[in-house]
Amino acid sequence: MKITAARVIITCPGRNFVTLKIETDQGVYGIGDATLNGRELSVVAYLQEHVAPCLIGMDPRRIEDIWQYVYRGAYWRRGPVTMRAIAAVDMALWDIKAKMAGMPLYQLLGGRSRDGIMVYGHANGSDIAETVEAVGHYIDMGYKAIRAQTGVPGIKDAYGVGRGKLYYEPADASLPSVTGWDTRKALNYVPKLFEELRKTYGFDHHLLHDGHHRYTPQEAANLGKMLEPYQLFWLEDCTPAENQEAFRLVRQHTVTPLAVGEIFNTIWDAKDLIQNQLIDYIRATVVGAGGLTHLRRIADLASLYQVRTGCHGATDLSPVTMGCALHFDTWVPNFGIQEYMRHTEETDAVFPHDYWFEKGELFVGETPGHGVDIDEELAAKYPYKPAYLPVARLEDGTMWNW
């Protein structure tokens, strides 16, 4: 069995997605996601110029060997562009292997560890009252876990506050938009949101919050401490993870569970945080961390230290990544939760899939492979559109972490 083609497909049914389709001499094909939000064409170039030509003639069943080839063979390893290209190849190969075996991907990974996948949705509003109402909307839809983000008085375009009730897409056309940030204002306001949420809905639902790398270690510890009475499922990305020792300070001052890792690319990014038990959830993704082959290694390491998975699942990941993540979630023993932001109807049409939502959980189907395909004819009707993620500045104009 040989790979005969590896084609890159770019489409924008509401936002940009990069898809790799690997074809074989036996007529079986697989698809993988290579989307890097706001930097999509960098991965396209890497795939087309440096990866796809090398795959022709290889045996697609040799998943591990091909993973090592595209990782070690490049010499310039790691990084978001390289690892997303590797992830796309890896997803497509697992898709092919599961199709050849005639079984859904989770069976090939080791079978079910659970029936349904608990997911969390994104509720947001321009102020506390609007966010409380939005959380109620998600509860009415059956969600058991909801991330809550609110606009903060005096902060321009606070993170996580979208233009609609169900869809949040921060990437803008043209050049990056400028948002604001003021830690003092956020620390004074965010705890009030969760106080009101618990007062309104009680403690029967899981609540989550994303700091999005905005806080210093001391500020993050302060926020975690203030949120303790409201029993959050987790506080995500409370401080930039490049400074991993910072999580030791946060850990020493709060028992609010900590989650990090959506921007991690390899096990080396997560190793110290996991082994030192400085986090509770690892949020590395199938597309960001080099595919299922490498994400399994991260999860296996995490399981030794009682760290659970909580894969990133925003709309910057295509349904291909979501499908792979759900098969991974169905298998992985140390599963925690799965982020789930609904895609647009146009995106769902371009990427037909067999997973579905019911009563706060996602379920995978029994289709051989990862259960997600791409309608190339429809995809061609949505050409690429340049879009950048925003940037953030403090009130005095200083650049900050978006």
Curated annotation (Swiss-Prot):
Ranges that cross the membrane: none
Residue numbers annotated as active site: Y159, H212
Binding site for substrate: N37, H122, E262, R283, H312, D316, E339
A molecular-function term among this protein's GO annotations: mannonate dehydratase activity
UniProt EC number: 4.2.1.8
Reaction catalysis annotation: D-mannonate = 2-dehydro-3-deoxy-D-gluconate + H2O
Keywords: Carbohydrate metabolism, Lyase, Magnesium, Metal-binding, Plasmid
InterPro entries per record: D-mannonate_dehydratase-like (IPR034589), D-mannonate_dehydratase_GalD (IPR053379), DgoD-like (IPR034593), Enolase-like_C_sf (IPR036849), Enolase-like_N (IPR029017), Enolase_C-like (IPR029065), MAND (IPR034587), Mandel_Rmase/mucon_lact_enz_CS (IPR018110)
Tagged with keyword Metal-binding: yes
UniProt cofactor(s): Mg(2+)
Pfam family, one: MR_MLE_C
Family: Belongs to the mandelate racemase/muconate lactonizing enzyme family. GalD subfamily.
Name of the protein described by the UniProt record: D-mannonate dehydratase
